[in-house]
Amino acid sequence: PLWEEKVRVDANATFSRNRISNYTAWFDQYDNQENYAWMGQISKDYGSTNISYSPDVISAVGLTWQPGKAFYMNLLGKYVSKQFLDNTSDESKSIDAYFVSNLSAGYTFRKTRMGEIDLQLYVNNLLNSAYVANGWAATDSFTDGSTIHWIGYYPQATRNIMARLTISF
């Protein structure tokens, strides 16, 4: 059948459970939030925790249509599960799971005066998803027992388009 020769589906998935069996965190301690005089460090035992930036699931599925030797089109979807920004497994210091899809197409001009020309077009983040794929976290502790969590996120690009031209001679 026609679809067997022209359509390909690729998929992959990684499932993991990355843990620290007995985690102890060290935090800078300050006298108070007004003065911020450094008093040293304190430790806190968390027991078994998730390793930072280690999602439990990463998966992707791609659909490629190639009706001939010169043209192709590919749709790719990628899912990444929740990640923690540090090793404490604190929900407030985590990145939500996200799904992003990309579309690409290409055409090869095989016999030209300049040689072989490949023209490719990419539409990244096709669904224009707002998502975060990385970040940082830190905690300041105070002698009265209070804490401040500093959290920063690195949002990823919304929909963007890129083209590539390759000339082989």
Predicted region positions:
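Short structured motifs
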Residues: 46, 88-90, 148-150
